[in-house]
């Protein structure tokens, strides 16, 4: 029968600065099943290095190491991690209990990496192990609430949870007083009597005396190997020791993944303020994405509704801009439309139902001691019907008022609010660019289209605007209502030909253009889509900055938790387990930040509606996009810290100061 542990000519050296220090110099050793071995030696003798190799926390530079006849050198990292979990139990001088976890969770920690599905019996098993060391009543305490001796007993309970064949104890009484040291050694002695193989490192002869075999080391070599004449009689076992081959569940298995999620949440909540500050960048980024995209989408929908109200059979005729020697002459500099053009186009019946000219300008509106700067629109008689602008209160001006150039006005709700507050504006006299006008109507509320307030407007008769207020003899444009929607293209071609003929323009002249509402809708939709993408891109920069902040915090976390990583690997965590844990933590922080940012973004969007009156629309797409992007950001920026954590060697991580 092969030995349980067998070393042949093992050598191990470490590089310290520019010097190479030999820790083990050709050590050969055999340990049988059921032995209690104490390895003694002064500091620097190589005893801890030997224990680390025996416990699979380190690998030799030269020589061979076999466990139950299997060469460790042929095993993969995952296979060695599995052996640490199933075969070995570790008791450390520094206890290595995770301070943010309860005693019960510390004891159950090896089960996370065991490949065994979590069950209701797991808690009972943890309680049973704590009862063995006399700490069942401390189940929900944290390590900081225990004495040193109690913490070491918890470490022993943790080492036993997987029922290992071998207990590796590294100076188990080094940090304890005499009474606690005796209690720990009684527990180890009892485990040996139950058949456990125990390999213990100590520098105290009275502690080594508990063992049946004492190996003494000096300068990396074994100088003595003594066995007691009266060794403890162990229960006989005829069955050979076989290395376990338990399959590890895939990382996406929900029960295994839930363990990593629980661990990640504990890590996040353990440093609440730091986690919150780390999430802040993601929170701002997601809130910006939601608010900006809601604003852009709201503007697009508002414009679509307004264009829809205008009708799909509407044409807009505008004078184009000509260039002389490369210099633009401005809109309508060549082709200028007059009221006569409007009358001529309106006469194209039955193709055309109505036509109305418009002029645009700015107005300084004054009432009493209040004044307001607004947009001025001079419109024809049919404009109110054609553009859904008929007053909700009061009336539209008459054809006679238009002909007489009467000074009457329809004002938007914004102008009414600024000048009159809550009082009725009808019949009141206001000054528009220092000219007295009588308010005869209140225009229907249309709200905002993006940042543009459609209710900040004053409408007056076209003739009044041209000849009394603005002093113009040409129009800004003409709106044409086609009799039937399916004849819009025909009407556009007919009107274009008519204008060229009337103004004696060549066929290829581009000094005017005609657009229907569909074209305008496409143009505005394209513009708002571009603006939404631009705003979203700007907001996404915040997410990237937040992701960099997450990466920075995770790198700091890896450094702070180096010993914890070493402990987890000693308990059987694979490289992929460590990587997954840190990725879940990173993604968890960004997702939490994303959810908070989502709520803040929705609040900001609703606030813009309530306070500024802007049209906003929160789409499911923007919510899903922001949430997905925050998760991807966490995974992407958490990858490097996770890889760095996974690459740490167990023994180096445990030694980290």
Swiss-Prot record:
Alphabetized InterPro entries for the sequence: AAA+_ATPase, ABC3_permease_C, ABC_transporter-like_ATP-bd, ABC_transporter-like_CS, MacB-like_ATP-bd, MacB_PCD, Macrolide_Exporter_MacB, P-loop_NTPase
ABC transporter domain span: 5-244
Keyword set includes Repeat: no
Subcellular location(s) per record: Cell inner membrane
GO biological process: response to antibiotic
SMART domains: AAA
Domain of life (superkingdom): Bacteria
Catalytic activity, EC: 7.6.2.-
Membrane spanning stretches: 276-296, 533-553, 591-611, 620-640
Keyword line: Antibiotic resistance, ATP-binding, Cell inner membrane, Cell membrane, Membrane, Nucleotide-binding, Translocase, Transmembrane, Transmembrane helix, Transport
Catalytic EC class: translocase
Membrane-protein topology: Multi-pass membrane protein
Residues the record lists as binding ATP: 41-48
Stated role: Non-canonical ABC transporter that contains transmembrane domains (TMD), which form a pore in the inner membrane, and an ATP-binding domain (NBD), which is responsible for energy generation. Confers resistance against macrolides.
Protein name: Macrolide export ATP-binding/permease protein MacB
Organism from which the protein derives: Chlorobium chlorochromatii (strain CaD3)
Gene name as annotated: macB
């Amino acid at each position: 029968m092969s030995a349980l542990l067998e070393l042949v000519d093992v050598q191990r050296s470490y590089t310290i600065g520019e010097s190479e220090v030999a820790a083990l110099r050709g050590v050969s050793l055999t340990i049988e099943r059921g032995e209690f071995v104490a390895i003694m030696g002064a500091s620097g003798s190589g005893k801890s290095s030997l224990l680390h190799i025996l416990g699979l926390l380190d690998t030799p530079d030269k020589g061979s190491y076999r466990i139950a006849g299997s060469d460790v050198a042929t095993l993969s990292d995952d296979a060695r991690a599995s052996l640490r979990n199933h075969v070995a139990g570790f008791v450390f001088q520094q206890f290595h209990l995770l301070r943010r976890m309860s005693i019960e969770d510390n004891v159950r920690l090896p089960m996370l990496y065991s490949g065994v599905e979590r069950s209701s019996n797991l808690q009972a098993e943890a309680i049973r192990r704590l009862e063995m060391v006399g700490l069942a009543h401390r189940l929900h305490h944290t390590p900081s609430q225990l004495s040193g001796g109690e913490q070491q007993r918890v470490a022993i309970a943790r080492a036993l949870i997987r029922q290992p064949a071998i207990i590796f104890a590294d100076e188990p009484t080094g940090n304890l007083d005499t009474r606690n040291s005796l209690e720990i050694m009684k527990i180890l002695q009892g485990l040996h009597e139950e058949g456990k193989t125990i390999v213990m490192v100590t520098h105290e002869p009275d502690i080594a005396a508990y063992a049946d075999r004492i190996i003494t080391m000096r300068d990396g070599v074994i100088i003595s190997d003594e066995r007691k004449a009266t060794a403890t009689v162990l229960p006989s076992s005829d069955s050979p020791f076989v290395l376990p081959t338990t399959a590890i569940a895939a990382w996406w298995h929900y029960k295994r993944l839930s363990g990593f999620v629980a661990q990640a949440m504990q890590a996040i909540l353990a440093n609440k303020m730091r986690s919150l500050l780390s999430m802040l960048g993601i929170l701002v980024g997601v809130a910006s994405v939601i608010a900006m995209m809601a604003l852009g989408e709201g503007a697009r929908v508002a414009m679509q509704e307004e264009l829809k109200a205008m009708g799909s059979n509407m044409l807009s005729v505008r004078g184009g801009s000509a260039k002389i020697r490369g210099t633009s002459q401005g809109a309508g500099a060549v082709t200028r439309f007059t009221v006569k053009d409007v009358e001529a186009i309106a006469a194209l019946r039955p193709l055309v139902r109505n036509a109305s000219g418009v002029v645009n300008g700015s107005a300084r509106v004054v009432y009493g001691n209040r004044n307001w700067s607004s947009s001025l629109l001079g419109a024809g008689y049919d404009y109110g019907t054609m553009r859904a602008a008929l007053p909700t209160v009061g009336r539209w001006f008459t054809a006679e008022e238009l002909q007489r150039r009467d000074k009457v006005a329809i004002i938007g709700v914004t102008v009414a609010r600024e000048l009159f507050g809550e009082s009725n504006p009808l019949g009141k006299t206001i000054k528009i660019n220092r000219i007295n006008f009588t308010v005869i109507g209140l225009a229907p509320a249309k709200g905002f289209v993006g940042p543009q307030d459609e209710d900040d407007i004053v409408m007056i008769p076209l003739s009044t605007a041209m000849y009394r207020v603005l002093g113009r003899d040409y129009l800004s444009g003409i709106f044409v209502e086609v009799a039937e929607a399916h004849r819009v293209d025909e009407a556009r071609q007919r009107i274009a030909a008519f204008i060229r003929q009337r103004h004696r323009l060549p066929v290829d002249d581009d000094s005017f253009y005609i657009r229907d509402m569909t074209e305008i809708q496409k143009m505005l939709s394209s513009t708002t889509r571009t603006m939404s993408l631009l705003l979203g891109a700007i907001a996404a920069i915040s997410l990237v900055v937040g992701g960099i902040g997450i990466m920075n915090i995770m790198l700091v976390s890896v450094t702070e938790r180096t010993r914890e990583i070493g402990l987890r690997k000693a308990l059987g965590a694979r490289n992929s387990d460590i990587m997954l844990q840190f990725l879940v933590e990173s993604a968890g922080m960004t997702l939490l930040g994303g959810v908070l940012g989502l709520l803040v973004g929705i609040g900001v969007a609703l606030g813009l509606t309530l306070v500024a009156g802007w049209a906003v629309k929160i789409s499911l797409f923007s919510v899903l996009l922001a949430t997905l992007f925050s998760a991807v950001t966490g995974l992407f920026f958490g990858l490097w810290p996770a890889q760095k954590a996974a690459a740490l060697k167990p023994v180096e991580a445990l030694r980290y100061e």
